[in-house]
């Protein structure tokens, strides 16, 4: 299955981002993205979608109820044909509409923290009496940025040297994902939540996490069911199918290119399943992890680490059903940081 690298969750001047569509495409090209999914707030500028300067540009939307106070419940809607903003006050009605349009619904930044210094509210998801969502955003770069910005000094450090502070998804978000996985399949995505905002404190001004930087940071690696052909509709649908199936992993490529990372189930030399797939318990079933870079590889079963190895590969014989997923960590600037999170293999 061909691997393509892209970014999900970015904003333009159509809502509260600082970059126009041509500018955001240029940033995507600089980062060598194969695809980019924009998610402007409460609007759906469909006419911008298409192949733009070699980048597959998919237009989705991030919907929320602007009248709700405090603010919460942001939903990323991909593959929808109509603007569903009017349904924002009812999360369940919104989810039902996304599914009627054969779209994909992902809960954005389900867990958030907001220190007082940022003057920004935390915007978590709070209404969990819902059904019909496809997954959650387990790593939101802007959310982590906000959580670490506890003082002017730390904010300046984040603005100019984010990789010295950013370490990975919130533990609370990963725990939430594992709890949800006990009863349903939940696809994990990650993204930058790119806005290109400016930080101003007195005479100092800095762009907060510029688009070109963010597009090299938390990225989505999909395994498509066919190679891109250059036909927009066909290639867009291939990306959306891969996301729906969970045929993807999330990677912090700013600390090491993860292209080629693989997690699969084998019986002997026969590959039976990959990320997002299900496989039955059987004799000689083995889970295999391969990494293009040396890393601290961790295999989790139902949220608990069952095997850990530092290196380029990991193998584990499986006799027990459950949800298996992989986390990988690498050292960067003297600190262990999250690098790769795979979607699960479901052993039934």
Regions found by a protein language model. Name each.
Residues 1-3, 23, 183-188, 192-348:
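C-terminal functional module detector
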């Amino acid at each position: 299955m061909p691997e393509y690298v892209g970014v999900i969750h970015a904003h333009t001047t159509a809502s509260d981002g600082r970059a126009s569509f041509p500018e955001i495409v240029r940033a995507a090209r600089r980062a060598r993205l194969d695809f980019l999914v924009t998610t402007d707030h409460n609007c759906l500028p469909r006419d911008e979608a298409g192949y733009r300067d070699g980048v597959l540009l998919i237009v989705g939307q991030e919907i929320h109820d602007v009248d709700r106070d405090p603010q919460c419940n942001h939903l990323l809607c991909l593959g929808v044909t109509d603007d569903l903003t009017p349904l924002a006050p009812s999360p369940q009605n919104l989810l039902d509409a996304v599914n009627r349009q054969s779209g994909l619904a992902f809960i954005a930044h389900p867990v958030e923290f907001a220190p007082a210094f940022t003057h920004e509210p935390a915007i978590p998801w709070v209404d969990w009496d819902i059904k019909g969502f496809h997954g959650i955003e387990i790593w939101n770069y802007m959310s982590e940025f906000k959580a670490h910005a506890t003082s002017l000094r730390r904010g300046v450090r984040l603005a100019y040297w984010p990789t010295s502070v950013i370490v990975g998804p919130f533990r609370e978000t990963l725990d939430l994902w594992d709890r949800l996985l006990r009863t349903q399949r939940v696809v994990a995505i990650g993204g930058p939540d790119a806005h290109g905002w400016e930080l101003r404190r007195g005479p100092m001004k800095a762009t907060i996490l510029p688009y070109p930087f963010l597009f090299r940071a938390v990225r989505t690696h999909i395994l498509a069911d066919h190679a891109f052909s250059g036909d927009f509709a066909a290639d867009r649908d291939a990306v959306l199918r891969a996301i729906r199936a969970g045929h993807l992993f999330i990677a912090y490529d700013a600390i090491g290119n993860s292209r080629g990372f693989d997690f699969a189930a084998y019986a002997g030399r026969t590959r039976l399943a990959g990320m997002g797939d299900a496989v039955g318990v059987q004799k000689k079933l083995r889970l295999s992890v391969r990494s293009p870079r040396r890393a601290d590889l961790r295999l989790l079963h139902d949220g608990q680490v069952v095997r850990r190895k530092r290196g380029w590969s990991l193998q584990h014989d499986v006799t027990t059903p459950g949800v298996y997923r992989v986390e990988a960590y690498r050292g960067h600037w003297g600190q262990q940081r999250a690098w790769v999170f795979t979607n699960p293999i479901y052993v039934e």
